[in-house]
C-alpha cells in the first residue's frame, strides 16, 4: 500500500515566486525583450532650401526644391548634368497656362539652380508630404518586420506644425502592398484587343450537364459554326416533297427583237388579231391612216419611221406607190387576244383636215385706245354696272314705318327704299 508523502514546506518569502513579482504592477514595469522592443526609425525633416530627391510608389524620381516639384527630364552622365521639369509643365495650373520653369542639378543631385520663373505659387505642404512618404517607403523595405502603422506614427512626428497625412489607413495599405510586391517581377501589361468578337466569348459551366457542350469561340468567325451545327441537329425536318408532284415552271419567253418595218406599211391598214379591217380601206388621207393605226396598235408606233413615211408619201403622191399594191402587213405580231382593242367609230373614217398656219400679214392691227374707250359697247357696259342694294334692317323709327306703309288700306306690305349712292359718296350732294 502506497502512502502519501507530505510535501516539503518552503518559505514563501524566500521563494523566487514572490506575490509581488507576479502582480500586475510589476508585470507592466518589466522591461520588454529585445525582439519586441519598438525600433526607432529616424526621418529627415523637410527643408525647402535644400534640394531633396524623393522616390514615388511607382519608382519615379522627383526633385523638391523651394516648395516646387520637378520630374526628371534629361540625364547626361558625360557632362555631369541632370535636367528637371516642373510638374505643371503638362498639368494645367489654376491660371490656365503651362509652367515653363526648369531646374538643373549635377549627377549627385546637388548644386540646384532654376531657369525661368514659375507661373504658380509654391506648394510646401504637398512637397513635404511627398518627401516624408518617400522616406516611409525606404523604411518599410529596410524593416520588413516592423509594423506599418507604427512607421506612419513615427513619421508624423517629423512633420511640420499643421501638416498631416490625409488618410493613414490608405497609406498603410500602400506600404503593405509595396512590401508584398518587393522582389516579384511585374506583370506585363496586356494590350487591349480591338476584335469585337473577343467580348462575345461564351463560357459553359461544368456543373450543368443538361446543357450541350460547345467549343469556346475564337477570334475567327468560324467560332459560330459549332453553335449553328448543334442548333440544326436539334431540329427534325420532314420533307413534304415525297408525295407532292413536282411543278415545272416554263422558262420565260425571250424578248423579241423589234424588226424595222417598211415606211409604206405604216400608212396601210393594219390587220388586228389576224382579221383585216375593211372599214380602214376607205381612208385615203395618210395622216388619218397613221392615227388609225396608232390607236389600234400603240406599241408599233415609231416616230422616226412615221416621219420618213409621211415625207416619202408627199413626194410620190402624184404617181402610184408601191404601198398601194402591196398586201397589208400587220404592224405587230406580238399583240395578244387579251390586249385592249378599241373599236374605231365611223366618224374616224372621215379625213382629218390639215392644220392651218396663221400668216402674220393677214392679221389686222388693233384700233387705238381712244377709239376703244369711246365705243358705244364700252359705254353701254358701264351703264349696266350693278348697283348694290341696301335693304331695311329693322332700324327705322315709328314715323319712318308709318311713311313706308303701303297706300292701300288694309295691306300689310311695306315700301322698301333703295339708295343709289356709292359707299362714302352721295350722288345728290355731287349734283348740288
Swiss-Prot record:
Region (Disordered): 1-33, 174-195
Annotation: DNA-binding region: 30-188
Keywords, ordered alphabetically: Developmental protein, DNA-binding, Metal-binding, Nucleus, Transcription, Transcription regulation, Zinc, Zinc-finger
Record carries keyword Zinc: yes
InterPro entries, A to Z: Znf_FLYWCH (IPR007588)
GO molecular function: RNA polymerase II cis-regulatory region sequence-specific DNA binding; zinc ion binding
Superkingdom of the source species: Eukaryota
Biased composition (Low complexity): 9-26
Function: Putative transcription factor. Binds to specific sequence motif 5'-[TC][AGT]TGCC[GA][AT]-3' in regulatory elements of target genes such as myosin myo-2. May modulate gene expression, perhaps acting in opposition to transcription factor pha-4. Involved in morphogenesis, perhaps especially in formation of the pharynx. Plays roles in molting, feeding and morphology.
Protein name: FLYWCH-type zinc finger-containing protein peb-1
Subcellular locations according to the entry: Nucleus
ZnF (FLYWCH-type) residues: 53-120
Keyword Zinc-finger: yes
Any Pfam family: FLYWCH
One GO term describing the cellular component: nucleus
Organism: Caenorhabditis briggsae
Single biological process term from Gene Ontology: positive regulation of transcription by RNA polymerase II
Amino acid at each position: 500500500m502506497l502512502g502519501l508523502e507530505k510535501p516539503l514546506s518552503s518559505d514563501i518569502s524566500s521563494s523566487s515566486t514572490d506575490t509581488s513579482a507576479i502582480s500586475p504592477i510589476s508585470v507592466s514595469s518589466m522591461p520588454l525583450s529585445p525582439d519586441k522592443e519598438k525600433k526607432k526609425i529616424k526621418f529627415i525633416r523637410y527643408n525647402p532650401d535644400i534640394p531633396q530627391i524623393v522616390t514615388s510608389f511607382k519608382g519615379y524620381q522627383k526633385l523638391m526644391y523651394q516648395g516646387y516639384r520637378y520630374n526628371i527630364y534629361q540625364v547626361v552622365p558625360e557632362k555631369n548634368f541632370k535636367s528637371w521639369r516642373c510638374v505643371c509643365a503638362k498639368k494645367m495650373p489654376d491660371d490656365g497656362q503651362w509652367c515653363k520653369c526648369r531646374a538643373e542639378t549635377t549627377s549627385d543631385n546637388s548644386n540646384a539652380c532654376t531657369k525661368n520663373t514659375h507661373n504658380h505659387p509654391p506648394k510646401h505642404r504637398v512637397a513635404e508630404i511627398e518627401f516624408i512618404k518617400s522616406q516611409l517607403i525606404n523604411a518599410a523595405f529596410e524593416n520588413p518586420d516592423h509594423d506599418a502603422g507604427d512607421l506612419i506614427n513615427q513619421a508624423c512626428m517629423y512633420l511640420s506644425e499643421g501638416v498631416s497625412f490625409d488618410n493613414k489607413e490608405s497609406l498603410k495599405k500602400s506600404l503593405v502592398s509595396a512590401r508584398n510586391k518587393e522582389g516579384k517581377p511585374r506583370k506585363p501589361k496586356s494590350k487591349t484587343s480591338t476584335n469585337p468578337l473577343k467580348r462575345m466569348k461564351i463560357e459553359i459551366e461544368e456543373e450543368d450537364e443538361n446543357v450541350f457542350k460547345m467549343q469556346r469561340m475564337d477570334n475567327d468567325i468560324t467560332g459560330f459554326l459549332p453553335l449553328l451545327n448543334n442548333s440544326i441537329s436539334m431540329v427534325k425536318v420532314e420533307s413534304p416533297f415525297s408525295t407532292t408532284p413536282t411543278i415545272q415552271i416554263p422558262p420565260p419567253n425571250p424578248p423579241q427583237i423589234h424588226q424595222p418595218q417598211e415606211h409604206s406599211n405604216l400608212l396601210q391598214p393594219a390587220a388586228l388579231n389576224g382579221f383585216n379591217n375593211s372599214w380602214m380601206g376607205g381612208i385615203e388621207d395618210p395622216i388619218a391612216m397613221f392615227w388609225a393605226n396608232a390607236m389600234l396598235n400603240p406599241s408599233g408606233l415609231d416616230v422616226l419611221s412615221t416621219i420618213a413615211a409621211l415625207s416619202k408619201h408627199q413626194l410620190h403622191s402624184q404617181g402610184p406607190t408601191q404601198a398601194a399594191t402591196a398586201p397589208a402587213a400587220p404592224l405587230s405580231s406580238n399583240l395578244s387576244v387579251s390586249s385592249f382593242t378599241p373599236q374605231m367609230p365611223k366618224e374616224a373614217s372621215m379625213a382629218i383636215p390639215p392644220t392651218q398656219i396663221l400668216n402674220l400679214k393677214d392679221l389686222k392691227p388693233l384700233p387705238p385706245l381712244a377709239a376703244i374707250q369711246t365705243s358705244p359697247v364700252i359705254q353701254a357696259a358701264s351703264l349696266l354696272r350693278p348697283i348694290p342694294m341696301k335693304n331695311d334692317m329693322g332700324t327705322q323709327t315709328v314715323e319712318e314705318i308709318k311713311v313706308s306703309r303701303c297706300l292701300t288700306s288694309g295691306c300689310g306690305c311695306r315700301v322698301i327704299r333703295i339708295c343709289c349712292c356709292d359707299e362714302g359718296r352721295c350722288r345728290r350732294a355731287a349734283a348740288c
